[in-house]
Amino acid sequence: MTERRIIHIDMDYFFAQVEMRDNPKLKGKPVIVGGKASSRGVVSTASYEARKYGVHSAMPMSQAHKLCPNGYFVTSNFGAYRETSAQIMSIFRSYTDKVEPMSLDEAYLDITELVRPDLPASKIAQYIRKDILEQTHLTASAGVSYNKFLAKLASGMNKPDGLTVIDYQNVHDILMTLDIGDFPGVGKASKKVMHDNGIFNGRDLYEKTEFELIRLFGKRGRGLYNKARGIDHSEVKSSRVRKSVGTERTFATDVNDDEEILRKVWELSGKTAERLNKLQKSAKTVTVKIKTYQFETLSKQMSLRDSVSSEEDIYNIAYLLYNDLKDPDVPIRLIGVTVGNLEQSTYKNMTIYDFI
């Protein structure tokens, strides 16, 4: 039986990162997302600079202001977060359909079928993080292991912008020394019960019998007993049916030079064709999307009589669509190429290994 390989990707201080990307003046500043300092709301996300002052998620905004009076308080922009999240999930699904999103900024990926001797799971995780950085200009932390629990644990061990692998060689040492509050799923209430019963780290938890843990925590006790041993049989659950394939890029600076933009369209057409080939699919619609320097999003789609899957065919259609969309006087900051209305190809295509 092939050993499972699971990746857990967790974006670093996601909302704050998006705000700093879209407003470079905030970079390196203590950014607190959630609302005005005087509001009655709570903190959604705080940058690492703000966390140094003790600010954290779910804290009342008024308290955050007391701790960090010179912080940059930003109202949540969920439209931007959802749009960026969709980009990230699209990247995940370009590698595997076995993706289980847990929120806008984290997901599990089962990449068992992609792993081979010269392409370990850690390298695939590196490729994914690189794609996220190139396409969204955001960093992500990744955890790699043989089950979901350990992958999630690993993703939080070297934040921000980290990659951690937990395998059979190091799992025991990691779990035995882990503070009980750092076990995924152990909140404040559970932590207090643990402390009241002499459980302060993974070793203390490991030494409790299953019966003792069930007595303390009910049905959850069995799960805690297994976690102390690094056991988790839960599957990556994905019910999504792929409807489209695409990729997009944000330029380092706003661009209105056709030659530079069309070079990027060619590159994106190639990436999209590669992903179609991996899936052994062809497409009957092509869409080009641009975002102007004023953050206005424009798109144009063409439906086709015959399906396409090659780089050249996709580019030729994308070229026409871009020419319909462009305004020589309006620079753009992002361009994307997406194909949809997918159908099964009638010939054998490349696999992921042909283009990783």
From Swiss-Prot:
Listed cofactors: Mg(2+)
Gene Ontology MF annotations: damaged DNA binding; DNA-directed DNA polymerase activity; magnesium ion binding
Localization annotation: Cytoplasm
Ligand binding (Mg(2+)): 10, 105
InterPro entries the record matches: DNA/RNA_pol_sf, DNA_pol_Y-fam_lit_finger_sf, DNA_pol_Y-fam_little_finger, DNA_polymerase-Y, DNApol_IV, Rev_trsase/Diguanyl_cyclase, UmuC
Active site: 106
EC number: 2.7.7.7
Catalytic activity entry: DNA(n) + a 2'-deoxyribonucleoside 5'-triphosphate = DNA(n+1) + diphosphate
Domain UmuC, residue spans: 6-187
One Pfam entry name: IMS
GO CC terms of this entry: cytosol
Keyword Transferase: yes
GO biological process, alphabetically ordered: DNA-templated DNA replication; error-prone translesion synthesis; SOS response
Main EC class the enzyme belongs to: transferase
Top-level taxon: Bacteria
Cysteine pairs bridged by disulfides in the record: none
Site residues (Substrate discrimination), renumbered to this chain: 15
Note accompanying the cofactor annotation: Binds 2 magnesium ions per subunit.
Assigned protein family: Belongs to the DNA polymerase type-Y family.
Role noted for this protein: Poorly processive, error-prone DNA polymerase involved in untargeted mutagenesis. Copies undamaged DNA at stalled replication forks, which arise in vivo from mismatched or misaligned primer ends. These misaligned primers can be extended by PolIV. Exhibits no 3'-5' exonuclease (proofreading) activity. May be involved in translesional synthesis, in conjunction with the beta clamp from PolIII.
Name of the protein described by the UniProt record: DNA polymerase IV
The species this protein was found in: Staphylococcus aureus (strain Mu3 / ATCC 700698)
Lineage: Bacteria, Bacillati, Bacillota, Bacilli, Bacillales
Gene behind the chain: dinB
